[in-house]
Every structure is written in structure tokens, then in C-alpha cells.
Amino acid sequence: RAARVVTAPKYPGGTNALYAFLRENMCKPQIAIETAGYGTTTVQFIVTRNGEVVGADYKRRCNERVDKEVLRLVNMLSGWTPATKGGKPCDAVVQISMSIFPSFNASAQFVGVR
């Protein structure tokens, strides 16, 4: 039974710290804000058993400039506590969705372990 227990990866400081990092480090070029409209960019990535972010790629795109900014931010994330399966660190898939116009909004979702 314990071999099936899975825990999600955790960003240092938790979900609120993750959202604060994204908000505080986001560059909002004026043209991106003007052209983004209402849309969300979703990036999926792997948090490795070492807590590193690898393989970030788009799942949903909104606007080229906004998409690039979300991908840049995701690639800056580091220091995760890895997911575990059966008490052992393992790779995990995570998705982050962000919109920046008309206001910042973000959500993170644990997809599963690998």
C-alpha cells in the first residue's frame, strides 16, 4: 500500500510563494498587454527527482510574446521539493497556466508522476 502513495512536488514556500514569484518576476511588455486580449498560456514541465525544472513546453498558447514570457518564468523556477512515490523521489509532471491581461492570474496543477 505504501508503495502506491504519491505526493506532489512542492515549490519552496508553497503555492502562494510560487504565484508571488511569477507575479514579481513577470515582464509585461506594453505590446504584449495591448495584444494579449483575454487568454491563458499553459506550460507543462517536469520537476525531476532532483527538484529541477526540465522539458518545459506549451500546452496552450495565447499570444507569442505572452507565451514566451510564461515559458521564461517557468524555466526560472528552481529548488522544488520533488514528488515522491512510495516514499522515494520521482519525476513529476506539472502544468502552470497564466494570464496577464487584464490582470495577472495563475494556477498550478500536479498532473502525475513518471
Where on the chain are the PLM-derived regions?
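Charge-biased low-complexity segments
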Residues: 1-114
